[in-house]
Design a protein with these regions (language model features):
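Carbohydrate transferase catalytic cores enriched for Leloir-type hexosyltransferases
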Residues: 1-328
Length: 328
């Protein structure tokens, strides 16, 4: 079969969906029984290296990272590619796919239902755009992949798709890596990691509940003067609330914001953490907690949404809406 996978929806800085795309299809492309055709932004070196064994169709990133051109690519260019290369299956990794009827079977991955459950986490445009496409996918996709039972339950609650075409395929992460001493020391020096530290990894946005984590950490600092909080992740929606809270609590000298880091830097920082704290109030899966457990780091996470499903008995669960629960 000829299978088309659209990687143009994946940002250069790989978090969440980006990690899913890279790691899942790195394994899938070992399949020699089918032919894979991959649509990739021409500046995404990470994906190009991952997909080098498959047929790659480039698109100009300077144009197609703008929504209008992105929409054109998805709605018109992809159908043309399906026709030209006699595609049998087209897989969309991020909710949306062509509205034009295709001969190819359509597979779509649903990562979470934040557009319905936490609409304020998105711009008004994105909120309604993806609500439409999730509903459209549930009606017209031939197969719907949910990344957790929690996401499937949310989908059933808000949309009620046809059960026969939905299935749960959980995410996975890389095996732990061993890093040389020079790389470890260079990373620690780069980010000023000189004391033991608690670690959070994720985009700075309200859904990640970092403000409550900071309030709980301020209480920890009063009892342990030799511990820092390291926050790894890029700035997201309403990130200023997080920065403001650090100043209000007077803990700026104990909180380290790394910004976005490379994959190697992320895992070096993770492997050296005293504990990993993930107080998110909603996740479709929650890949960082799985990565933390894989590296055998003591992990504390929320007792809601998909997170109990992901960690099982391998982490401590807490109430993310209760400061004392996070602190304890």
């Amino acid at each position: 079969m000829n299978i088309l996978i659209d990687f143009t929806q994946i940002p250069i800085q790989k978090v969440g969906v980006g990690v899913y795309a890279r790691e899942t299809f790195f394994e899938l492309l070992r399949d020699t029984n089918n032919k894979y055709c991959c649509l990739v932004q021409d500046d995404d070196k990470d994906m190009l290296n991952t997909l080098k064994s498959s047929k790659i169709i480039f698109v100009k990133s300077k144009w197609f990272r703008f929504f209008f051109f992105r929409f054109f690519l998805e709605q018109f260019y992809i159908p043309w590619i399906c026709y030209k290369y006699k595609i049998n299956i087209v897989h969309s990794l991020h909710y949306s796919f062509p509205l034009i009827p295709l001969r190819a079977k359509k597979v779509v991955t649903i990562h979470d239902l934040t557009f319905f459950i936490y609409p304020k986490a998105h711009t008004i445009f994105k909120r309604y755009y993806f609500r439409f496409f999730i509903r459209f996918a549930c009606r017209f996709a031939d197969e719907i992949i949910c990344v957790s039972n929690s996401t499937l339950n949310d989908l059933n609650l808000h949309i009620k798709p046809i059960k026969s075409k939905t299935q749960v395929i959980p995410l996975a992460c890389e095996q732990p890596k061993v890093f040389d001493l020079e790389s470890i020391n260079n990373t620690k020096a780069k980010f000023g990691l000189h004391r033991k530290y608690l670690l959070f990894i994720g985009t700075l946005e309200p859904r990640k509940n970092i403000v409550n984590l900071l309030i709980a950490f301020e209480k920890i600092v009063k009892n342990d003067s030799c511990i820092d909080l390291v926050i790894v992740g890029k700035k997201g929606w309403f990130y200023n609330d997080t920065l403001t809270k650090v100043q209000e609590l007077n803990i700026a000298n104990r909180v380290i914001f790394t910004g976005f880091v490379t994959t190697e830097e992320k895992f070096i920082i993770l492997s050296g953490a005293y504990a990993f704290i993930y107080p998110s109030i909603y996740e479709g899966f929650g890949l960082p907690v799985l990565e933390s457990i894989t590296y055998k780091i003591p992990t504390v996470t929320s007792n809601i949404s998909s997170l109990p499903e992901v960690v099982g008995q391998a982490a401590i669960l807490m109430n993310p809406n209760n400061i004392d629960s996070i602190y304890n």
